[in-house]
């Protein structure tokens, strides 16, 4: 919703840790919210909402300060797109992560496609074959593939090798004080 996006955009003027105290990080955009606009034929509002989400993700990606995401539970769709813009991720071992929009006939719109392609282009296979990365990303996103743990998420490039994996949710904030964030986030 707009309130969440406003809070994220405004918070990028300082080091930021994105965490949700509930069991789920984010299952993505509330589709009922956007369907209400569609049912009324108000497609301008949908366009405005998507553009605002894209701008929010861009603020996270290009913040002058470290942005750390601490996902747990469901981290899907727009939730993944928020996480993937972060400089660093400290993921709980109980995570379900992925871009699942295609399962409901949508295309990820918050930068997830771009970030996935960038991660896959950085592989040895992609350096040998220019078709490798786009086909791999198309397969993952097109089928709405999810990973159900950090162990599964890393080879799918949902998580990077440098991202932390944490078993105890109470450890998230202990890992990163603002001083530690400046030292650990590149």
Task: Describe each region flagged by the PLM.
Residues 46-50, 54, 58-178:
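Conserved catalytic cores of soluble enzyme domains
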Residues 1-44, 51-70, 92-96:
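A structural preference for short, pocket-lining loop segments at secondary-structure junctions
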Residues 179-186:
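Single conserved hydrophobic/aromatic residue that forms the stacking wall/gate
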């Amino acid at each position: 919703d707009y309130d969440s996006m406003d809070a994220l955009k405004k918070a990028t003027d300082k080091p930021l840790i994105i965490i949700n105290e509930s069991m789920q990080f984010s299952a993505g955009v509330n589709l009922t919210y956007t369907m209400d606009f569609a049912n009324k034929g108000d497609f301008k509002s949908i366009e405005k909402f998507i553009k605002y989400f894209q701008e929010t993700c861009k603020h996270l990606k290009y913040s002058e300060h470290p942005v750390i995401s601490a996902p747990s539970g469901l981290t899907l769709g727009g939730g993944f797109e928020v996480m993937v813009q972060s400089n660093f991720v400290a993921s709980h071992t109980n995570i379900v992560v992925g871009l699942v929009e295609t399962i409901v006939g949508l295309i990820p719109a918050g930068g997830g496609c771009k970030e996935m392609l960038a991660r896959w282009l950085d592989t040895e296979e992609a350096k040998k074959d220019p078709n490798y990365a786009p086909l791999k990303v198309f397969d993952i996103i097109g089928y709405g593939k999810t990973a159900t743990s950090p162990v599964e998420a890393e080879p799918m490039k949902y998580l990077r090798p440098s991202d932390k994996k944490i078993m105890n949710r109470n450890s998230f904030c202990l890992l990163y004080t603002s001083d530690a964030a400046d030292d650990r986030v590149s």
